[in-house]
């Protein structure tokens, strides 16, 4: 059986005695994207049947599917709330940035004092800017001066992962 099939079988076995509470520890780690989606559809159906589900996951897109999430770093709670509220409370601006030199882009962006955090996110780099200290145009000019081409910059809405990354950074600075 594939990893996804094994997880779905394990979930089915856990449901035999019709539990009111289901605790799952990273159930989709190492599972292909299609099986992950199917697994979460199964969890949604179980939730609709009144089963309470507690899930630990490192996948922030999965955490965003939950009713309430606890963001945890090194065993400490950073925030507990709904995904929607966590994202709405996020104050800094975030830009999605791409150029033809991804590694150099990450290095250059991290040199900017206006940048609070900067990390790879899919094909782009997510750049967090505190207090609107830099505009898209200023960011574009900085990258052009540093030899970047094919630059794409877009202001974006934060994701749960963006919020987690920023809260993690703040926690590490406070310790």
Where do the model's predicted regions map?
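Hydrophobic anchor residue at the start of the ABC signature
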Residues: 11
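Conserved catalytic motifs of ABC-family nucleotide-binding domains
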Residues: 18
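Catalytic Walker B motif of ABC-type/P-loop ATPase nucleotide-binding domains
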Residues: 22-25
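Helical segment within the ABC ATPase nucleotide-binding domain
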Residues: 37-49
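Conserved ABC ATPase "signature" C-loop
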Residues: 75-76
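ABC ATPase "signature
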Residues: 80-81
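Short, charged/small-residue-rich alpha-helical element at the C-terminal edge
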Residues: 91-170
């Amino acid at each position: 059986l594939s990893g996804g099939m094994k997880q779905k079988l394990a979930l089915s076995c856990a449901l035999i005695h019709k539990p009111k509470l289901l605790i799952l520890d990273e159930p989709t780690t190492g599972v292909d994207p299609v099986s992950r989606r199917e697994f979460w559809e199964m969890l949604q159906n179980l939730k609709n049947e009144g089963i309470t589900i507690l899930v630990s996951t490192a996948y922030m897109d999965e955490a965003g599917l939950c009713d309430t999430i606890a963001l945890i770093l090194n065993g400490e709670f950073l925030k507990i709330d709904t995904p929607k509220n966590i994202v709405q409370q996020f104050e800094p601006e975030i830009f999605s940035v791409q150029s033809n030199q991804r590694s150099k882009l990450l290095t250059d962006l991290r040199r900017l004092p206006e940048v609070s955090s900067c990390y790879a996110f899919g094909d782009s780099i997510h750049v967090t800017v505190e207090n609107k200290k830099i505009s898209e145009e200023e960011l574009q000019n900085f990258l052009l001066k540093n030899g970047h081409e094919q630059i794409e910059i877009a202001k974006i809405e934060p994701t749960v992962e963006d919020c987690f990354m920023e809260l993690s950074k703040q926690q590490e600075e406070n310790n």
